[in-house]
Amino acid sequence: MGSTSSLYAAIDLGSNSFHMLVVREVAGSIQTLTRIKRKVRLAAGLNSENALSNEAMERGWQCLRLFAERLQDIPPSQIRVVATATLRLAVNAGDFIAKAQEILGCPVQVISGEEEARLIYQGVAHTTGGADQRLVVDIGGASTELVTGTGAQTTSLFSLSMGCVTWLERYFADRNLGQENFDAAEKAAREVLRPVADELRYHGWKVCVGASGTVQALQEIMMAQGMDERITLEKLQQLKQRAIHCGRLEELEIDGLTLERALVFPSGLAILIAIFTELNIQCMTLAGGALREGLVYGMLHLTVEQDIRSRTLRNIQRRFMIDIDQAQRVAKVAANFFDQVENEWHLEAISRDLLISACQLHEIGLSVDFKQAPQHAAYLVRNLDLPGFTPAQKKLLATLLLNQTNPVDLSSLHQQNAVPPRVAEQLCRLLRLAIIFASRRRDDLVPEMTLQANHELLTLTLPQGWLTQHPLGKEIIDQESQWQSYVHWPLEVH
């Protein structure tokens, strides 16, 4: 057995897709080894009597035969298979499940909507950064889960019987993307939401997180179109107009929307617009994980950390043998600089967090080689799994690390969309200066400094005589002033 005993698998038999996640436990965190997803569209096989067609069941079994091959290497006690909305509804679910268990060689559990909502919330709590008090929205194929909670604790759980497959069959059956079909789909979704809206609003939230294919598709569209990753009602309405303009489902073309997501995109979009409107949501971001992650973390009995980003940074520092003392030293200098200029530059708290995160990882490129360390660092951060950081935040971190020294590549700072371009430039300047002044790798050799910002001009004041006593330091700072001046960042050092 050996190396397979640390493997865990979670399978989710959803109404639209079947998913399998295989992970390995590594030092209290999970490393993803396999993700397999197949569009089975089980919900589309339900007739008016809620009986599943033989074709739909066969599609499901065929998919499970693929999964079964991968499961043979994993201890049965470390596998969880759950079925959701369609198999809760189907009158002949028993037939499907009996054969599914035979194929997989392990039990299949049909979970209630509330249990599904709880697991989704756990998956989000383990993998998503940001404020503690959250609303989680997951639009599935045949049900939509809405959960409020604080930290690891849920405060209200709802599973509503509407989903992107059932709404597709009901309101877009003619494949027409006209305003009237969207209106009908949204109106119906709002009616389903209305009875639970008050309780959700009563519990309240500081952040709203989406955890489903629809939200993933929106994120992909927004990244492809160079928008920032925050989903707002205004952006949803713009995408709806674009869909209406396309006219028919088979002609739906939106930059960044993949073919496999296109079929259920309009119905998912209508449900999401209804949720935004009914609950008065200002903005939503994509979750780092959901149902499958909830199942895996549940099997591992890992506690939810208050600060997921910190856990992620710690794990990566250990894995790449980063000098943690030096990372902290640079972070301390950068935080000091940030605090001195934040009012003048109107910087937000999240920008400070991201700057400190960049400091914690700035030497990761050395684990590959000293030559081109910034490029190695950017590559690693762009491609590592970083729970707690959104895709846009990862891109910003990679861009900051790419520009931590040497001439500045301004276009890369403008291509990220986690923060406005000007803020990315400002964070980059602070990171570069912090790295320079902590470079002797000793706390007692970091000088006392004041940094003042006046619009784009930075004035750095060093102790009397410091520049004369540190000729190499002076040379490095002169070079830095020159590099910053090339991109019109005025820097004066006294």
Curated annotation (Swiss-Prot):
Top EC class of this enzyme: hydrolase
The keyword Ligase is annotated on this UniProt entry: no
Domain of life: Bacteria
Family to which this protein belongs: Belongs to the GppA/Ppx family. GppA subfamily.
SUPFAM superfamilies for this protein: Actin-like ATPase domain (SSF53067), HD-domain/PDEase-like (SSF109604)
CDD domains membership: ASKHA_NBD_EcGppA-like (cd24117)
Gene transcribed to yield this protein: gppA
Hydrolase listed as a keyword: yes
InterPro entries: ATPase_NBD, GppA/Ppx_hydrolase, Guo-5TP_3DP_PyrP, Ppx_GppA_C, Ppx_GppA_N, PyroPPase_GppA_Ppx
GO BP of this protein: guanosine pentaphosphate catabolic process; guanosine tetraphosphate biosynthetic process; nucleobase-containing small molecule interconversion
Pathway where this protein functions: Purine metabolism; ppGpp biosynthesis; ppGpp from GTP: step 2/2
Protein name per UniProt: Guanosine-5'-triphosphate,3'-diphosphate pyrophosphatase
EC numbers, comma separated: 3.6.1.40
Gene3D superfamilies noted in UniProt: 3.30.420.40, Exopolyphosphatase. Domain 2 (3.30.420.150), Hypothetical protein af1432 (1.10.3210.10)
Summary of the function given for this chain in its UniProt record: Catalyzes the conversion of pppGpp to ppGpp. Guanosine pentaphosphate (pppGpp) is a cytoplasmic signaling molecule which together with ppGpp controls the 'stringent response', an adaptive process that allows bacteria to respond to amino acid starvation, resulting in the coordinated regulation of numerous cellular activities.
Family annotation (Pfam families): Ppx-GppA, Ppx-GppA_III
GO molecular function: guanosine-5'-triphosphate,3'-diphosphate diphosphatase activity
Reactions the enzyme catalyzes: guanosine 3'-diphosphate 5'-triphosphate + H2O = guanosine 3',5'-bis(diphosphate) + phosphate + H(+)
This protein's UniProt keywords: Hydrolase
